[in-house]
């Protein structure tokens, strides 16, 4: 077993989150509004969930309009893979770390409101695109805005909740993901079928601007009221080095990159796969994917949040074990579902796969915050998003698109089916990484 080594930089008294400081005995925080001790701060969490909802909505509507968009501009699978993958993920990831540094010191609620409004306006402007290069520019502009979303969101949620209910809090936050995908696939498919793909972007952008204004009005920033208090005997250090010095955290990130590859490859290419292999139209595709990723994704996220909080009492490594089991099962069902001849049986297996694909993010997001302290929560979240987006979104959709074009000569319209085999392969790799991470404990859990 690898032995964890303490971080290299000098250690200073750890500054607990507001919620954990109350548990540590700081009476001055007991009457503070907005701090949830053993319970969920529902109003802030509702607003946080809405931010994640429009974050996924503005990102996923691109895949539901893949076929009409490709037909209008004559795009290849490789070009669409670039637009969905590395063309978005590279800028998103590069901006993530300076944004996280700001979020670790500044007003996260204000940052979230500004970022949400920015990416939503850029989403609406995507509807004015005239070809590949204007689409790429619009996607890059959306990425600039979305870079200010997830890291401060994770940091703020962790500071609002103590460790006893943190997984449930992140489960509520992550409900925005499947709900956003439901709206993107069902709503986007319906609008595209009734009007055109441009209208989809206009509507999604308007929804996002409204959410940004709500966040500006009602989302609290814990640090506005009172800074977190030092607690004797605890240690921390800010920045990335203390996190990356721990082998468990590195294994966690490796698994996250592989799972992200599978997740975003599935989200991006599932509509095209259903259209080509089962001749489904955009409206029916949106309904199937909306119910799959939306309804069953919600069930999966809620269940895994409850299970993780209960298991963690006896097993501190429960987060990694639950995530490893979920993606391991998803890998098996994904491999089976790709080659079932019947549309009905393939869709049933697809639902089970989606539940596994939806289940890993809550335990992994929570596990990342176990390694972090309030001084580097947003930085830890930025590392997580680096793995998910550059390793996952950047590689997954692009790789599938390139492989599909390479396999056209041998498999014609079925080339995408074989290119999607990277989904079960990367899920199996993620499961192995997280099982390894489960044997390693954080040096100073938060």
Language model regions located:
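Cytoplasmic helix-loop-helix junction between adjacent transmembrane helices
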Residues: 138-178
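Extracellular/periplasmic helix-loop-helix junction of adjacent transmembrane segments
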Residues: 65-94
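Extracytoplasmic gate region of multi-pass secondary transporters
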Residues: 62-63, 247-301, 357, 361, ...
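Structural signature of the two symmetry-related core transmembrane helices
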Residues: 110-124, 318-334
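Conserved MFS/SLC helix-loop-helix module at the cytosolic interface between two early adjacent transmembrane helices
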Residues: 94-133
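Helix-loop-helix hairpin linking two adjacent transmembrane segments in secondary transporters
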Residues: 173-217, 221
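Juxtamembrane intracellular "pre-TM" segments in multi-pass secondary transporters
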Residues: 28-38, 222-253, 277
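Helix-breaking motifs and short loop linkers at transmembrane-helix boundaries and internal kinks
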Residues: 74, 107, 128-134, 145, ...
């Amino acid at each position: 077993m690898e032995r964890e080594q303490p971080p290299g930089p000098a250690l200073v008294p750890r500054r607990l989150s507001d919620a954990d400081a109350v548990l540590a005995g700081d009476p001055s925080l007991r009457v503070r509004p907005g701090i949830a001790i053993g319970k969920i701060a529902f109003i802030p969490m509702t607003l946080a969930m809405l931010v994640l909802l429009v974050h996924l909505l503005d990102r996923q509507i691109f895949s539901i309009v893949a076929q009409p968009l490709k037909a209008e501009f004559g795009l290849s699978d490789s070009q669409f893979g670039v637009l969905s993958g590395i063309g978005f993920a590279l800028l998103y990831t590069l901006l993530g770390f300076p944004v996280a540094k700001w979020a670790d010191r500044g007003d996260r609620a204000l940052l979230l409101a500004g970022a949400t409004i920015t990416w939503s306006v850029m989403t609406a402007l995507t509807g004015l695109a005239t070809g590949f290069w204007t689409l790429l520019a619009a996607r890059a502009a959306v990425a600039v805005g979305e870079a200010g979303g997830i890291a401060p969101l994770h940091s703020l949620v962790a500071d609002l909740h103590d460790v006893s209910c943190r997984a449930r809090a992140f489960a509520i936050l992550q409900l925005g993901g499947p709900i956003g995908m439901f709206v993107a696939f069902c709503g986007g498919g319906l609008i595209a079928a009734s009007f055109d793909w441009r209208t989809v972007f206009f509507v999604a952008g308007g929804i996002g601007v409204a959410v940004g204004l709500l966040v500006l009005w009602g989302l609290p920033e814990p640090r506005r009221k009172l800074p977190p208090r030092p607690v004797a005997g605890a240690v921390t250090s800010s920045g990335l080095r203390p996190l990356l010095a721990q082998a468990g955290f590195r294994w966690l990130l490796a698994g996250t990159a592989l799972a992200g590859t599978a997740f975003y490859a599935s989200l991006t290419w599932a509509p095209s796969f259903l259209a080509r292999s089962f001749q489904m139209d955009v409206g029916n595709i949106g309904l199937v994917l909306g119910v799959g990723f939306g309804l069953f994704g919600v069930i999966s996220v809620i269940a895994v949040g409850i299970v993780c909080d209960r298991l963690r009492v006896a097993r501190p490594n429960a987060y990694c074990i639950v995530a490893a089991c979920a993606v391991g099962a998803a890998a098996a069902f994904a491999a089976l579902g790709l080659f079932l001849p019947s549309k009905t049986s393939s869709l049933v297996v697809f639902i089970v796969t989606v539940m596994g694909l939806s289940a890993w993010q809550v335990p992994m997001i929570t596990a990342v915050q176990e390694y972090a302290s309030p001084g580097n929560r947003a930085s830890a979240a930025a590392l997580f998003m680096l793995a998910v987006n550059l390793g996952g979104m950047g590689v997954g959709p692009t790789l599938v698109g390139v492989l599909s074009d390479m396999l056209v000569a041998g498999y014609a319209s079925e080339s995408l089916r074989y290119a999607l085999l990277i989904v079960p392969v990367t899920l199996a790799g993620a499961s192995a990484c997280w099982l390894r991470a489960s044997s390693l404990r954080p040096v100073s859990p938060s």
